């Protein structure tokens, strides 16, 4: 029974990731006035499965001078962490109802840095190492703003449990009252997942392919799956935090559909941003965070601390 539950949890996520790669190629294709994949299956719908078969049947190559154990562990760790983050998400029911769900997600997203660092260092390639160091610096930096934004949301929500956010947003979505935080959160998730215009870790013009330059076949596919699973989970988090997942507590199927549609819309905006904007320079990326986002998020956090005290009202869960 445990194995069946595990498969029912993992397989839909992997299918969603597979079709996200297809949607990305289609969206980018139409934005550049071309078709995108349209040969394998009707309208190219079987393209992700063809890619998976190709990648997992190829021989996984390994550089002669690489550190073998870390080189193998890094992609497995990346995919495991990307799949584990889904556990506490209420959609509208979570797999495990954690009291500290938000801290759990923050901790796991911090751990994903290790897989990137290990892969870059174990490859014994200068391009991979520079890409990994960039990714680590970028991820750790933007996690600061993400943590402060989460703290601000928790001050409004009154609990670290994700499920209570559904109750908090029954009458009004939090994006209405906290739109500056929502805006900074969305841009920070772009940087956190190493997406354009913050894809400095995979700067093709400078670093060939970034931290995964020495990976091929199965291990490369694992990194790829982890990256896209993180994109979907970050957009799911945005939906839960700011866009209220429930329409009516009695119609759970409708709530799930609403949650899926909002997450899909946010994910397509991710792809739209990739098609529209050029890559940031590294100093601009850091300047945006430390000089712009951090002071504003701290100010917003202080505002949300002082408001309930000033108006003598308390969050719903205390």
From Swiss-Prot:
Q: What compartments host this protein?
A: Mitochondrion inner membrane
Q: Where are the transmembrane segments?
A: 3-23, 68-88, 102-122, 146-166, 172-192, 223-243, 253-273, 294-314
Q: Does the keyword GTP-binding apply?
A: no
Q: Name one GO molecular function term.
A: NADH dehydrogenase (ubiquinone) activity
| Record membrane topology | Multi-pass membrane protein
Family membership noted in the UniProt record: Belongs to the complex I subunit 1 family.
Provide the protein name.
Answer: NADH-ubiquinone oxidoreductase chain 1
Q: Give the originating organism.
A: Perameles gunnii (Eastern barred bandicoot)
């Amino acid at each position: 029974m445990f194995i069946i539950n595990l498969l029912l949890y993992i397989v839909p996520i992997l299918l969603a990731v597979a079709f996200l790669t297809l949607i990305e190629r289609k969206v980018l294709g139409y934005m550049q006035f071309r078709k995108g994949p349209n040969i394998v299956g009707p309208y190219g719908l079987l393209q992700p499965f063809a890619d998976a078969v190709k990648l997992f049947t190829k021989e996984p190559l390994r550089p002669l001078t690489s550190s073998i154990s870390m080189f193998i562990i890094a992609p497995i760790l990346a995919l495991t962490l990307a799949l584990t983050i889904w556990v506490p998400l209420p959609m509208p029911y979570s797999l495990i109802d954690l009291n500290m769900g938000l801290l759990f997600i923050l901790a796991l997203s911090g751990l994903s840095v290790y897989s990137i660092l290990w892969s870059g260092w174990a490859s014994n390639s200068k391009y991979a190492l520079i890409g990994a160091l960039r990714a680590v610096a970028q991820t750790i930096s933007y996690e600061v703003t993400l943590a402060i934004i989460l703290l601000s949301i928790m001050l409004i929500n009154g609990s670290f449990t994700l499920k209570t956010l559904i109750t908090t947003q029954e009458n009004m979505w939090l994006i209405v009252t906290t739109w500056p935080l929502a805006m900074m959160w969305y841009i920070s998730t772009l940087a956190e997942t190493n997406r354009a215009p913050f894809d400095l870790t995979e700067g093709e013009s400078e670093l060939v392919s970034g931290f995964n330059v020495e990976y091929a076949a199965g291990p490369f596919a694992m990194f790829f799956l982890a990256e896209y699973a993180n994109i979907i989970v970050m957009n799911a988090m945005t939906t839960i935090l700011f866009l209220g997942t429930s329409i009516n507590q009695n119609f759970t199927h409708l709530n799930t559909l609403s949650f899926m549609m909002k997450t899909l819309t946010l994910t397509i905006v991710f792809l739209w941003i990739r098609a529209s904007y050029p890559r940031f320079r590294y100093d601009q990326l850091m300047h945006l965070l430390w000089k712009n986002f951090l002071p504003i998020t701290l100010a917003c956090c202080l505002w949300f601390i002082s408001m309930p005290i000033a108006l003598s009202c308390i969050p719903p869960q205390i």
